[in-house]
Amino acid sequence: MNHKGPYMRKNITIGTTLRRISLILFCLLPLKGICQTGEATVDALVKMGFENVGWTEDTEERVFVIQNSAYRLEGVGIGKAVDLIQKMGLPENKPCRLIVLDNNVPQISLYYQPMKGDSIAEVSRADWSVSYDLGEGWKQARRIKKQNSSLFKVDIVVYPELLFRNYILSKVYEIVVNVSPAIEVSLWKGMKLTGQVIFPIYNDYGQRYKQIRPGFVTLSQTVRLPQRTFMTASVGFFNKFRWGGDLKAKHFFKDERFSVDARIGYTGRGYFEDWAFYHGTKWTLTGSIGANFYWPKYNTQFSLKGERYLEGEYGARFDMIRHFRYASIG
């Protein structure tokens, strides 16, 4: 089962986010910074459109917390935040950490460690390291009051959709083109409600695809577990006329080039016709388990998975994806 849809945040996975941020951090001329408190920086980040913004500081380090909603590409947004933090001023003689959230769930941290005896007058993005480790400062940062909360805000996202198949000899391809706007609402930490409507533009697939109908209608809860592990549970109506539940998890090892993931779904067939919902009685168990490797020299991701499909068949899948700044090819 392949539930790729609007509940995946801005079409960007956690692993892709880390790689794109890492790439952008090495593409900046030096910026000057002077030591200030974090209040002015927080205010400036809020004015830029970032959500869930806060800061804290102790004798060990200064920590900023943000969630990107101002920029379409996650890596570009985080790069802009790093620029601003450097411009507003880094702490003197102590590290600075930027923790990035998604729906209030911490994802990654960017860490700047000043060298002993070195001046902070010239600091660039390349001086920040990126990791899934959040550091000890997160224990304090998670309790601070954040500005510009994302809770109960409604995001509107429009997804174009192109489907094609080769089933008949008299036609090379049958094609479906849809435009599918969706709303996404953050209900509490990690919880998201997604509602989508599909508007057909062109259809060769038959009567069922000609109707304006609901797309993804889901409730999803994401949590971050200890040791760089993420888990998401979703229930609702998915793609491929499937409805039911889905659970996925991903763990990054200490060497963050390596990760493992697993997914299990329990769904039945259901569809809308004239806005009435019809469903069958057969439920199907699907799933996958796999391992991943990221090659930073070439910004390339490799993954190998074993999968169980809707008809009860088993198979293996290998992917190789090269990531660029604004696109991925694989």
Question: Can you describe what each PLM-predicted range is?
Answer:
Residues D255, W275-F277, K297-N299:
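Short helix-loop boundary/capping segments
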Residues R9-S22:
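Bacterial N-terminal signal peptides that target proteins for export
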Residues V177-L187, I212-L225, G244-I264, L285-W295, ...:
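Feature captures outer-membrane beta-barrel proteins of Gram-negative bacteria and organelles
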Residues N2-Y7:
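Short, Lys/Arg-enriched N-terminal segments with co-localized hydrophobic residues
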Residues V65-N68, I156-I168, L193-I201, P226-F238, ...:
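Transmembrane beta-strand segments that form the barrel wall of outer-membrane beta-barrel proteins
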Residues S170, G206-Y209, G244-K248, E273-Y278, ...:
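Outer-membrane beta-barrel translocator domains and adjoining extracellular loop/strand segments
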Residues F26-I34:
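Hydrophobic h-region of N-terminal signal peptides that target proteins for export
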Residues Q36-T218, G280:
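Outer-membrane beta-barrel initiation region
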